[in-house]
């Protein structure tokens, strides 16, 4: 009998796969509309900038006296003691939080909500930003870091500027140990070993005198867990797959 696959062990959810949430500083979200009214403007200040393990962007601790204190992804150039305005009447300057309908078109924004009150869902990683392309009625159109254009609610909040932490990928890891600790902070299993490099007892693609599955790797959608690896329920595979999809009108 073969050993359990990586995906089977992952699905069981033992501690080695669980997110190290107890090390996190805070969720990094905007306060709910019950705490900060969407139609009112507040003024706070940055108390602290802190690294959050497992997150690609530092967090800023914002305090609004006698109202709220919260952590959000910091903007590039944000500093301790900086005044931050939150609301529709806030100035559209770096670090301030405004609803999309109050932000000029063409502005760089990050930590963008999809719906008012969800706390921020888009462009949250270090160095990421979206661009407000246009506004129409109750909707706003933004261009995401991927280049995709998305329509969101115009009352959704966003932070002006670019998320801090840009350039983190420019420093090389240099050795495998650094990569190990990098992914350990995010509860990601590393390194990921290919199935064909394993022994036959460890994986359906393992074994043999050379690294090849030795048979077609397409498996059924309802295949049992120990067998369900490779091209799952694939319509086509190989060189002619792209042409076949084009003939069928598929993406």
Swiss-Prot record:
Cellular component, GO, one term: cytosolic large ribosomal subunit
Annotated segments matching region Disordered: 1-22
InterPro entries: NA-bd_OB-fold (IPR012340), Rib_uL2_dom2 (IPR014722), Ribosomal_uL2 (IPR002171), Ribosomal_uL2_arc_euk (IPR023672), Ribosomal_uL2_C (IPR022669), Ribosomal_uL2_dom3 (IPR014726), Ribosomal_uL2_RNA-bd_dom (IPR022666), Translation_prot_SH3-like_sf (IPR008991)
Keyword rRNA processing: no
Pfam families attached to this UniProt entry: Ribosomal_L2, Ribosomal_L2_C
Record flagged with keyword Ribonucleoprotein: yes
SUPFAM superfamilies, alphabetized: Nucleic acid-binding proteins, Translation proteins SH3-like domain
The protein, known as: Large ribosomal subunit protein uL2
Organism, scientific name: Ignicoccus hospitalis (strain KIN4/I / DSM 18386 / JCM 14125)
Gene, per the UniProt record: rpl2
